[in-house]
Amino acid sequence: MQNINPKIQDKINKIIYLQDEIKKWEEKDEFEIESLMKNFEKMTRIEGSVFYTKYFTDEEFANILLAIARKYPDNKSIIIDIITSLGMMITRYKLNETEEIYTFMLEYSSQKGISAYVSIYFPFLKRFEKHPNQWEYYMSMRKMTPKKIAQQKLVGIIEQNINNIPEKYKGEIIHFIKERHDAANNDFGKKMYLEMIEKIK
């Protein structure tokens, strides 16, 4: 049996404990679930390790998270923590992305105060490749809240796709990048945005 670093073992124990408690969610009240989800979501974002993979790729557990989301659709804290948990489990640990998870993300992709958290993961889901208008979605990120999260993600997406921007969106994107340039408070940021604009033109 492979020796596991004691610090990693402590984190594994915490993940197991949280998952076991979340699995008993129907016995708990909304406040308890909110607290458990907040702590579990944090565990999906800690420094990655192969030792966590089996826990974060558990499809049965992912379905429990979706069931909780269906039960508490108006609890913003629970929904955001489930979005982040599933997003990290898919993008970092390669949890199988199901139609149900994609639909769940899609449902909240334009909801005020939540859509920005969806935008961190939604464009990187396999099924997003079949989204009828990817660039329309990207452009909608400019108005998502929390603004800082969504706009930082949009800058990253523009950088990754800088040579594939459809002509019809170039003007809007350059305008957005100019706004970011003007708001930047350091020379490095301003230079980066100017270079992006030159590449887009």
Each language-model region and where it sits:
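N-terminal alpha-helical scaffold/docking segments in eukaryotic complex subunits
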Residues: 1-54, 195
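Amphipathic alpha-helical elements of HEAT/ARM-like alpha-solenoid repeat scaffolds that form extended
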Residues: 31-50, 77-90, 114-127, 150-164, ...
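Amphipathic alpha-helical scaffolding segments comprising HEAT/armadillo-like alpha-solenoid repeats
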Residues: 9-19, 49-68, 92-106, 130-140, ...
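Eukaryotic acidic, Ser/Thr-rich intrinsically disordered low-complexity regions
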Residues: 2-15, 19, 160, 166-201
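Alpha-helical adaptor scaffolds
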Residues: 74, 82-83, 87-146
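Helix-loop junctions that connect tandem helical modules in alpha-solenoid scaffolds
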Residues: 15-31, 64-76, 105-119, 139-149, ...
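Short amphipathic alpha-helix initiation/capping segments at coil-to-helix junctions
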Residues: 144-151, 166, 170
